[in-house]
Amino acid sequence: MIDGGRFGRILAINTFNYTDFMYRPRRDEELRTVDGGGVLFSQGAHQFDIVRLLAGGPVSEVYASTGRWDRERDTEISYQAMIRFINGVVAQCTYSGFARFDSDELMEWVGETGYEKDPGDYGNSRRALVDLTRDGELSAKRSRTFGASKLPTVAPSNEHFGPLIIQCERADLRVGPREISVYTDFEKEVVPVPLVKGPREPVFRALYDAVRFGTQPIQSGRWCLGTLEVCHAVIESAADGRPVYLNRS
């Protein structure tokens, strides 16, 4: 829709995601920033991939703050990042894994992988940790890792990463799990989005096409270095209280 030019160039992006990420069972290294723990390298990378792809240009500047709010889980639990691109686009990115407000409430209670969530489950993540020893938490983590359970083949909605609003010259676009809402000067249009075959299917398809057919993926090694640079810039900016200027991403 953006590449088609109907709505003009992108002006700004706003995206946020409030989850229970840091209060799910975690391994020791997932609670240490130096080992890639916290929300930035695991979750921020997804969010920064999204805005970089949409903005369509390299990042020039990052100004950010982070939250380390729990001594028992002493790593980045949240961040707020203002990202400027060399083409003039500005993206405001927020992520919180503090396990209180759940932004899926604003996504019709559709979870990140496209399956419906029960709002009555509020507080379950923190509650499950209350009586767990460290060994118990590690055991619980092993039971949740990749391949430990089988997801249904088709989700009723598409995957998402929280509310996402894109402002263009001639319209605002709000991306939801089932549709894209287009807000022009005088009317609103809702464009249905086709379902993918299953959770993570586009990721596995990109990997298969790269290996089997030599198709260049969007998220190449060079691309991922750019996203990693943004993650480190968020930490540096938050620590120093100043913008960080980039040259790779």
What does each model-identified segment do?
Residues 1-93, 97-114, 241:
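Predominantly a Rossmann-like dinucleotide-binding segment in NAD(P)-dependent oxidoreductases
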Residues 6, 30-31, 58-61, 88, ...:
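A general structural signal for short secondary-structure boundary/capping elements
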Residues 18, 195-200:
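Short coil/turn segments
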Residues 43-46, 199, 226:
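A generic structural signal for residues located within well-ordered alpha-helices
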Residues 97-165:
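Contiguous C-terminal substrate-recognition/catalytic subdomains in enzyme active sites
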Residues 99-103, 182-185, 199-200:
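A short local loop/turn or secondary-structure capping micro-motif enriched for an aromatic residue
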Residues 135-138, 142, 147-148, 154-157, ...:
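C-terminal helix-rich "cap/oligomerization" subdomain common to oxidoreductases
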